Regions:
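A short pre-motif secondary-structure segment
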Residues: 10-12
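Cytosolic regulatory/linker segments at or just downstream of nucleotide-handling modules
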Residues: 75, 104-177
């Protein structure tokens, strides 16, 4: 599955929705988990486009559409429920934000929060969609629609921001070794 390939945990299916979370049981850190989730969503979006094209060619006039919402933040993860029925899941306000981002996304679109954008901005081109208020959330949520992934330059080099971050990570690791 695409989600598992990128390190995601498939939490549950809710009607026609699928909930995937990153960071547990194994985490690469908040930044890398957010980036993995963005990569997963882009691969899922590509696969859906391929399926939609195939189904149209097979005569299905209106193949289904997919919306994705991604938020980054801390949640409670574990076994919840009663002794008779425990469920390994993720709960919390940040989960609610992700669900509401999904509901607000355009058909076949990916809507992300600023918290996710901050970690993955060098991977994607986005369109700012403004801040939205969500019932039960005590802050406005800045949103961005993912337009596409950032393409490497003709020589295959990564964007400059990615290079400098790699350098900073290496420099930090060297400092810790002293």
């Amino acid at each position: 599955l695409i989600a598992q390939k990128h390190g995601g945990t498939i939490d549950k299916y809710i009607g026609d929705a699928m909930m995937v979370f990153f960071g547990d049981p194994d985490s690469e850190g908040e930044r890398e988990d957010a980036r993995a989730c963005v990569r997963m969503s882009l691969e899922m979006q590509d696969k859906i486009k391929d399926l939609q094209k195939k189904w149209r060619n097979e005569g299905f006039a209106d193949p289904f559409e997919v919306r994705m919402g991604i938020n980054t933040g801390y949640c409670n993860v574990g076994n919840f429920g009663s002794e008779q029925r425990l469920t390994y899941t993720v709960i919390g306000g940040e989960v609610n934000v992700a669900q509401r981002l999904e509901a607000a996304a355009e058909p076949n679109g990916i809507l992300i929060s600023y918290e996710t954008y901050a970690h993955a901005q060098d991977l994607i081109d986005v369109e700012p969609k403004g801040a939205i208020q969500m019932k039960g959330i005590n802050r406005d949520i800045k949103t961005f629609a993912i337009l596409n992934r950032v393409v490497k330059n003709q020589q295959g080099a990564a964007p400059e921001s990615e290079k400098s971050e790699d350098y900073l990570i290496k420099e930090t690791n060297l400092d810790q070794a002293e």
